[in-house]
Amino acid sequence: MNCSSTAVLLETVNFAAEKHRNQRHKDPEGTPYINHPIGVARILSHEGEITDVEVIQAALLHDTVEDTDTTFEELESVFGATVARIVQGVTDDKSLPKAERERQQVEHAPHCSHQAKLVKLADKLYNLRDLNRCTPEGWSAQRVQEYFEWASQVVKGLRGTNAAIEEKLQQLFLERGVKL
């Protein structure tokens, strides 16, 4: 990675950290939310061997529009059209009911750009590992299992994107008795 890539990624991390600064995970420790997008970016870099800086940027920013006051226009103006487009490809419409958002994720997964599919895969892997580590407050064992089953449906539509990440997801699904 060259110096300008490092500077770009640090600027992206700083932007995401500012946007997510008051958010916490639903785990008992109240982990800072920024750990999630950083973890998703790290999975892409370290496990998926992704070196495309724009994909890593999109991973760092993937929840900013969905969960903060960030707009796609702001992302495009600060980080460029490609990063904004990748983030758009992984962003749910929060105005829709949760069940409809989940249905759309399954339906839209096969039609995303390759770059958006990478972010989706890493996001699912991070979330499933997190659920194995610690059940969110208010979640039953059944809800966790249902999340795994739903995530497997999304991941089915992302097959052929990144063998290393898909293999790790497959292992998690097998451990849970969920067919892919």
UniProtKB/Swiss-Prot annotation:
Gene3D superfamilies (alphabetical): Hypothetical protein af1432
Binding site for Mn(2+): 36, 62-63, 123
Transmembrane segments: none
GO MF terms held by the record: guanosine-3',5'-bis(diphosphate) 3'-diphosphatase activity; metal ion binding
EC number: 3.1.7.2
Cofactor(s) required, per the database record: Mn(2+)
A Pfam family per the record: HD_4
SUPFAM superfamilies: HD-domain/PDEase-like
CDD domains for this protein: HDc (cd00077)
Swiss-Prot/TrEMBL keywords: Hydrolase, Manganese, Metal-binding
InterPro entries in the record: HD/PDEase_dom (IPR003607), HD_domain (IPR006674), MESH1 (IPR052194)
Catalysed reaction, written as an equation: guanosine 3',5'-bis(diphosphate) + H2O = GDP + diphosphate + H(+)
Catalytic residues in the record: 66 (nucleophile), 67 (nucleophile)
Ranges where the HD domain occurs: 33-128
Stored PANTHER family: GUANOSINE-3',5'-BIS(DIPHOSPHATE) 3'-PYROPHOSPHOHYDROLASE MESH1
Family to which the UniProt record says this protein belongs: Belongs to the MESH1 family.
Chain's role: ppGpp hydrolyzing enzyme involved in starvation response.
Protein name: Guanosine-3',5'-bis(diphosphate) 3'-pyrophosphohydrolase MESH1
Organism: Danio rerio
